[in-house]
């Protein structure tokens, strides 16, 4: 009997949406959006992250001034309890993703284990 992996993937998606980790991200992000200062800082930080990623993908160097700005943003973010809570929730979800990924690739790892 053939297994439809996409059905299982869709079930996993639904389970993730119902998880405590996902709910924590939703709740933390709602707090960020409710506080305009937190929201502005978070949006600015995300723009900086995207800019850095684009530059890295294009092989461009990140300038000293840009690094300084990013460090200043990171310091502000550490001092913002709403964003800190969101980032902690994201880290928890990232850990779940890593553990799920290990489970998913286990069959391939077993093939190549010898």
From Swiss-Prot:
Transmembrane segments: none
InterPro entries the record matches: Com_YlbF, YheA/YmcA-like_dom_sf
Pfam families referenced in this protein's UniProt entry, alphabetically: Com_YlbF (PF06133)
Family label: Belongs to the UPF0342 family.
Protein name from the UniProt record: UPF0342 protein SSP0954
Organism: Staphylococcus saprophyticus subsp. saprophyticus (strain ATCC 15305 / DSM 20229 / NCIMB 8711 / NCTC 7292 / S-41)
Upper taxonomic lineage: Bacteria, Bacillati, Bacillota, Bacilli, Bacillales
